[in-house]
Amino acid sequence: MNYDRILIRYGEMTTKGKNRNIFVRRLKNNIARKLQAFERIQIEYMRDRMYILLNGEPHEPIIEKLKTVFGIHSFSLAMKCENDLDAIKETALAAVRQLPYKGKTFKVSARRVDKQFPYRSDELNYEVGAHILRQTDGLRVNVREPDIDVRIEVRQDGTYVTCRDIFGAGGLPVGTSGKAMLMLSGGIDSPVAGYLAMKRGLEIEAVHFFSPPFTSERAKQKVIDLVRKLTTYGGRIKLHIVPFTEVQQAIYQGVPNEYSLISTRRAMLRITDALRRRQRALAIVTGESLGQVASQTLESMYVINEVTNTPILRPLVSMDKLEIIELAKQIGTHDISILPYEDCCTIFTPRAPKTKPKKEKVFHYESQLDLAPLLEKAVNDTETLVIDEETGQGDEFAELF
């Protein structure tokens, strides 16, 4: 007897009340897309849990993929049997034998959801535990801190047996919180911000500012690779590549050096907001962390934000750099981010950028420029790629958007 299904437990979704079914259906669809290569699996869901019926598919690669699906609190390999004491004993024994149990400790934790079942939970614990002890060597009982917790749940449709919990990614299913535009550079911070935004249920579309010939095709490929890594957690993602050279040169030539960084960020935000309206998103996500660099002081953020009323979400705002780097390593974006290819944020860098810019001065300097047609041209000339986890870079859809 082998494990024939995977039991999935929801996390935060259990607090969603009347909207829970919306979250559960979205999670089911996200899992189905994630596991589309496993053609024989079936997904069954109910209000408080979900099952993946393996139907002969290998469980190891499925488990690895489930670890990256937001909305899953934990999951376990499971076996199902009839609501019969002997069947439950044999199923629990088979579940334990699937594990390296010698020299380990265990306990049985039974839960009788079906009150028509003739044995109480404590009786099940004793009967099943005694059977496992008799039929195995090198396994001992420890009811406080066991190595193996044999969980038995007797429900009306059958009894389910699990032995090991695997923690999921947590959060909410991607797509349940709406859509946002992620301002994605080639650095460490913004991919982590995108990951955390998706963890809160946001579908993201990435916006990258590309300034050839000052930035290379390798820098562009680096961003594509970062988006591909993020698709591990959020599924297919659109990447909007904005030609930014003309805008950046106009600012560099027309705005005093110490204010050029602020005006550049304001232009980026204007363009991202225009793309947001086009894509019907409701927010903008950035990788800003308060106080890290000159453009991320509170005074700078205030002046930069002035160009839009759109909500700006900053998932990293309370994190220090070491925390961000550690999370980047965990999600697999760090090694891509540190590749030595310049992006538009590292060219034309002012020698001494203002950390407390004056809004009136920014307005004055920008009023001397005719940026509006350049911004509109950048939006209209934006190239859009669709990046997919399984197939890599998708087709170009710039003409459709």
Swiss-Prot record:
Disulfide bonds: none annotated. PROSITE patterns: THUMP. Its EC number is 2.8.1.4. It is found in: Cytoplasm. GO terms for cellular component: cytosol. Pfam families: ThiI, ThiI_fer, THUMP. InterPro entries: Rossmann-like_a/b/a_fold, ThiI_AANH, ThiI_fer, ThiI_N, THUMP_dom, THUMP_ThiI, tRNA_STrfase, tRNA_sulfurtransferase_ThiI. It is an enzyme of class 2 (transferase). GO terms for biological process: thiamine biosynthetic process; thiamine diphosphate biosynthetic process; thiazole biosynthetic process; tRNA 4-thiouridine biosynthesis. Catalyzes the ATP-dependent transfer of a sulfur to tRNA to produce 4-thiouridine in position 8 of tRNAs, which functions as a near-UV photosensor. Also catalyzes the transfer of sulfur to the sulfur carrier protein ThiS, forming ThiS-thiocarboxylate. This is a step in the synthesis of thiazole, in the thiamine biosynthesis pathway. The sulfur is donated as persulfide by IscS. This is Probable tRNA sulfurtransferase.
